[in-house]
Amino acid sequence: MKNNLYVFFLFFITGLMSCSHHSGLYEHAEKIMSQHPDSVLTLLSTIQDVNDLSEKDRAMYYLLLTEAEDKTYKKHESDSLIAIATEYFDKTDDVKRKAKAWYYRGRVVDDLKDAPRAQDYYLKALQNEMEITDYAFLGRLYNSIGMLYTYQEVYEKAVLYQKKALYCFEALYDSIGQSYVLRDIGRNMTALNKMDSAIFYYEKALYFCDQKSKSSVYRELANLYLDIDNYSKGLEYIEKVLSSPLKKSMLDSFYFVLGKYYQKTNQVDSAYYYLGYSSNSSRLQTQAAAYYHLAQLERFRENWKGYANNQIRYE
């Protein structure tokens, strides 16, 4: 009932405005964007013909539309509309909207798996970095750049930007933002083989995680400790996962860690069972890791045919 009244209110205030004056509508949309992006989409849908808008209003429309779609997890298919916003705001002194336009253009092409263009657009969003005072926006921007570098396996640069994101989220006392960034820094430190640093960031992430997110960090810490042959600590975090709410989508990756623990502690039958289960995962990374450890089991048994078969599947 409350949501219906809210949408009615949006239509009401829209009706009070003439088609030639949209600034009030856009300002209201910006104010409610963080909490009600779905309502922003409803509000924007009341604008009849976007092509009749002024250049500025059209740029604002496409910026708000792209931002609201991004915040409601709608799949981006083209950057042609947000390009109208970047083209307009790049000619202005509106630092905040210029940065946002480039950021959301980067988000769109990031969705389209075009990493070089995404990187270019994200960095353009930072062209007036020192003048941007919106820490929530800066935190998201830095984090997006960090994630992009992570996917490209440029881990040192990823950590650099993720630490900047962390600073922003700390300034805002944003526990959710801090928990995700700390976890991601932990992952990149693991990739850099800086295990002590990885443990530090993972354990710090646990301080900010909600109960549902902790099981994922516990699992990653368990896997890390197994990699450095600290089986007692690995088991400690495995037990923490078992005592936490476990999402069905996490079963494959958790069973892989469990199988890896049994393989490393020579509990062969259990290792075969859990690694075999995780080798059927829909995630290629989990599949490959499971086949690698199944190959090691066969190598230990000197079953060279089984070793070769699993090694081929791993590679």
Question: What kind of feature is each model-predicted range?
Answer:
Residues 45-50, 83-93, 124-133, 163-174, ...:
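Amphipathic alpha-helical segments of tetratricopeptide repeats
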Residues 55-58, 75, 95, 115, ...:
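Inter-repeat boundary and helix-capping residues of tandem alpha-helical solenoids
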